[in-house]
C-alpha cells in the first residue's frame, strides 16, 4: 500500500476528537507489521516503537478530525448539536453527515431556515451553527431515539476521496490523516532495514480540542527530539494574499519555524538545522513558514517535562477544516522522504 492509498483509506474512516477508535484500529494493524511493539496508552494514543538503541525520536500525527455532537433532540426529531474542534459555521451548512447512533450509522443532512423564508436583512448575515439542525428523517423525538440517537451521539462529515486533475486529491479529514499516512509509510520503509535510533510512531488523540494526546504521550516517551506531522494552509488560490500564506501546493513539505506568532511553537534550532541539512543532502524541495494562525501537537510536545527539542513538518492543504480539503500527492510523497531521512540522520544532530 502506497502513502496515497493509505491516505484514501484513512480519510474514509470516521473519528472525531475522543472517538478515534476506527482510525486507531487501522493504524494499529498496519504498525504491528513494521514495529517491534505497539501499545495504546490510558488516554487512547497509539504508540509504536522500532529500534532499541540510540537517540529517541518521536514522530507524531493526530488521528482525530473535527466533527459534531448531538446536544438536543426536538419534538419533531431534528438534532441540535455542538461543534467538536474549530469549524467555520458556513462551511458545514447543507453538508451530508454520518450520525453514529447506538444501533448503527445514520445518514443525515445539515439544514437551516430556507432563504425563501428569510427577510432581506437575514440573507446578509452568516448562518450560525446554533441556527442549524441535523435532519435524519425522523418524524418525532421518540423515533430519533428509537433509531439510536441520544444526547452525546457523535457526528462526522460524509465525504469521499476524489482525484482532482493529475496530482491533487480532495476529501475530508486530511487534517490530519495526511500525517497518519506519512507515519505509516515511513515506518513501513524503516522496517526493511537496520536503524541506529529508537523511533516512536505516535497516533495522538484529541489534537483538535487542545493538543491533549500529544502532551500525554510525550510525557510517557520523553524523547530526545520530536517532529509533529500535520497540514498547513496553502495560499495559492483566489481570495488570499500571497504574503499572508506564501505556501503552495506541489512545492514540497512545509517546515514550520514559528506558529501562532510564537504563542505556539518556536521550533528548536537544532531541529531546523537537521531538517535543512537533510533536505539539501537528499535534494528534497521544502517550503519554510512563519505562521500567525493555528498550532499543532508540536506546541504541547515541546513543553513536556524539561522541554523537548521539537519541530513540525506539514503538507500544504487548501480549505482546511472543511469536508473538501485539497492536497497534492507529490507533497505527500516528498514529506515521506524528508521524515524518513531525518530519522536516518538523527544521531548526527542529537
Swiss-Prot record:
EC id = 3.4.11.-
Q: Which cofactor does it need?
A: a divalent metal cation
| CDD domains the UniProt entry points to | M42_Frv (cd05656)
Gene Ontology molecular function, alphabetical: aminopeptidase activity; metal ion binding; metallopeptidase activity
Q: Where does a divalent metal cation 1 bind?
A: 62, 175, 230
The residues listed in the UniProt record as binding a divalent metal cation 2, with positions renumbered to this chain, are: 175, 208, 321
Cofactor: binding details: Binds 2 divalent metal cations per subunit.
Enzyme active site:
207
InterPro entries reported for this sequence: Peptidase_M42, Peptidase_M42_aminopept, Peptidase_M42_dom2
Kindly list the biological process annotations in GO that this record carries. Answer: proteolysis
Ordered alphabetically, the record's keywords are:
Aminopeptidase, Hydrolase, Metal-binding, Metalloprotease, Protease
Q: Give the similarity note.
A: Belongs to the peptidase M42 family.
User: What is the name of this protein?
Assistant: Putative aminopeptidase MJ0555
Amino acid at each position: 500500500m502506497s502513502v496515497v492509498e493509505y491516505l484514501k483509506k484513512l480519510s474514509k474512516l470516521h473519528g472525531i476528537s475522543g472517538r478515534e477508535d476506527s482510525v486507531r484500529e487501522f493504524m494499529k494493524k498496519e504498525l504491528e507489521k513494521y514495529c517491534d511493539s505497539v501499545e495504546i496508552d490510558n488516554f487512547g494514543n497509539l504508540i509504536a516503537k522500532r529500534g532499541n538503541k540510540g537517540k529517541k525520536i518521536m514522530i507524531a500525527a493526530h488521528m482525530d478530525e473535527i466533527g459534531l455532537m448531538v446536544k438536543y433532540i426536538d419534538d419533531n426529531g431534528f438534532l441540535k448539536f455542538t461543534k467538536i474542534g474549530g469549524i467555520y459555521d458556513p462551511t458545514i451548512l447543507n453538508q451530508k453527515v454520518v450520525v453514529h447512533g447506538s444501533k448503527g450509522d445514520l445518514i443525515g443532512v445539515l439544514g437551516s431556515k430556507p432563504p425563501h423564508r428569510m427577510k432581506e436583512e437575514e440573507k446578509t448575515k452568516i448562518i450560525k451553527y446554533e441556527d442549524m439542525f441535523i435532519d435524519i428523517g425522523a418524524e418525532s423525538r421518540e423515533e430519533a431515539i428509537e433509531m439510536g440517537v441520544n444526547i452525546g451521539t457523535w457526528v462526522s462529515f460524509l465525504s469521499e476521496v476524489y482525484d482532482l486533475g493529475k496530482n491533487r486529491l480532495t476529501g475530508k479529514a486530511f487534517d490530519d490523516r495526511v500525517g497518519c499516512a506519512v507515519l505509516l509509510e515511513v515506518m513501513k520503509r524503516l522496517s526493511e532495514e537496520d536503524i541506529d535510533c529508537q523511533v516512536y510512531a505516535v497516533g495522538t488523540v484529541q489534537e483538535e480540542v487542545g493538543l491533549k494526546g500529544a502532551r500525554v504521550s510525550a510525557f510517557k516517551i520523553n524523547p530526545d527530539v520530536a517532529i509533529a506531522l500535520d497540514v498547513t494552509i496553502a495560499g495559492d488560490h483566489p481570495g488570499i494574499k500571497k504574503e499572508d500564506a506564501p505556501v503552495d501546493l506541489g512545492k514540497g513539505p512545509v517546515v514550520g519555524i514559528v506558529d501562532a506568532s510564537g504563542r505556539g511553537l518556536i521550533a528548536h534550532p537544532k531541529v531546523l538545522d537537521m531538517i535543512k541539512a537533510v533536505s539539501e543532502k537528499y535534494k528534497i524541495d521544502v517550503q519554510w513558514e512563519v505562521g500567525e494562525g493555528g498550532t499543532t501537537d508540536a506546541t504541547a510536545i515541546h513543553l513536556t517535562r524539561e522541554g523537548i527539542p521539537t519541530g513540525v513538518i506539514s503538507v500544504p492543504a487548501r480549505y482546511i477544516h472543511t469536508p473538501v480539503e485539497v492536497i497534492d500527492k507529490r507533497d505527500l510523497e516528498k514529506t515521506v522522504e524528508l521524515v524518513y531521512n531525518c530519522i536516518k540522520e538523527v544521531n548526527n544532530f542529537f
